Amino acid sequence: MTQHGFHAGQSRVRRASDDADVIVVGAGPGGSSAAYHLARAGLDVLLLEKSTFPREKVCGDGLTPRAVKQLVGMGITLEPADGWFPNKGIRIIGGGVRIELDWPELSSYPGFGLVRTRRGFDEIVARAAEGAGARLAEGVTVTGPVLDEETGRITGVIVRDTGDGVVTSDGAATGDRVAADDGAAGGERTYRARLVVAADGNSSRLSLAMGLRKRDDRPLGVAIRTYYTSPRHDDDYLETWLELRDGNALLPGYGWIFGIGDGTSNVGLGLLNTSASFAHTDYRAMLRSWLATMPAEWGFTEETRIAPVRGAALPMGFNRTPHYTRGLLLVGDAGGMVNPFNGEGISTAMESGEIAAQVIIQALARPDQASTELALQGYPQALKDAYGGYYTLGRKFVGAIGHPWFMQFATRHGLPRPTLMRFTMKLLANLTEPRGGDAADRVINALSKITPAA
């Protein structure tokens, strides 16, 4: 296989360069997107990943049309024969109502979504970055930043091998391989770069080391998921249930059943911290209780569960800022870019990676450090232009649905109204025409524009 970084022919080992134009820490969707676009522009990019592929990530595995657009833009083929399972839209169940909403037909986004497990998805996107010319190093843990003693600016990272004797590809057409500088597994070494992108997830130790902490005034979600063998594996809608309860109180979150198309389904639930129940919820017990209400023939039982129940935090609405400081740019979960409306973070991770790359490309083309820095300082504003007002609306939304009475009212009176629900789907998935469009598009875009940025 020769597409997206899987190179044919013999590989040869060479020693790694200790520097690059840009170091990207984390080869998830955001980091790999940034690395791809930077490498395509001809920059020397070192993409560092602490795990080795393939690896697991807690996720619903559902990809909205916004994420599909990013994949297409990276030249990734999305054929069902290659493991991409398409879907038509979302099915919502709640309050005795069941409604199917197709993804909107827009000129700006494809009219379909996909499902692909993160075990395969992340590697495909990372290999696309590798194929574009980025040097991908797997099994490498970043232990801290290298700082300029005078300015405090990040000039590189300190790394340590996981102990697997990792060998990593540089993405060259010949399939060259990059070996550790010191040749010893577990040895620390330093990589230097003009700029560093933090794409190291919700915990983002690199951001913390640079003094960037999470904001308590932004929403946070928690999601858990597992996998079952099930006859529902080939459902062509992403199914969501607004039926999570604490006693009789309806909670701000949803359960999901996403067919993967391979005989299995991703099943999980997510809850927002705007609920009074958030801190003391037993999520695994809630999942068991919810699944106990499902028809037996769907097969969601302990006997058909094929993976552990795993959980992860969902950092939302720019919950870590600033997104640029002293040579470090944040993308994806590291910058708290999960959509507060629906808990989806893959599309925004990939989009923010592309935005960061475009800012970096322009900045590094400047003739001096002062003008380069001026361009880099535009990155937070570029993110605010893309998401700021929309995320502020999202914060108001999650605050409202944190009240059980509001959640009950919205479910009872909103779901039976298809026109309202089509509007709601566009709002929650952030799927509108940027210019023109229908009345729903114009209303959503206007609200996002006039609302103060997050």
PLM region spans:
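C-terminal helical "tail/cap" subdomain of flavin- and related membrane-associated enzymes
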Residues: 361-454
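FAD/FMN-dependent oxidoreductases across multiple families
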Residues: 83, 275-359, 365, 371
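Conserved N-terminal glycine-rich FAD pyrophosphate-binding loop of Rossmann-like flavoproteins
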Residues: 52-74
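A conserved beta-strand/loop capping segment in the N-terminal third of enzymes
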Residues: 68, 73-123
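Predominantly flavin-linked oxidoreductase catalytic cores and closely associated redox partners
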Residues: 128-297
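Beta1/beta-strand and adjacent pyrophosphate-binding region of the FAD-binding site
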Residues: 13-30
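Glycine-rich FAD pyrophosphate-binding loop
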Residues: 39-59
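Conserved Rossmann-like nucleotide-cofactor binding loop
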Residues: 30, 53, 203
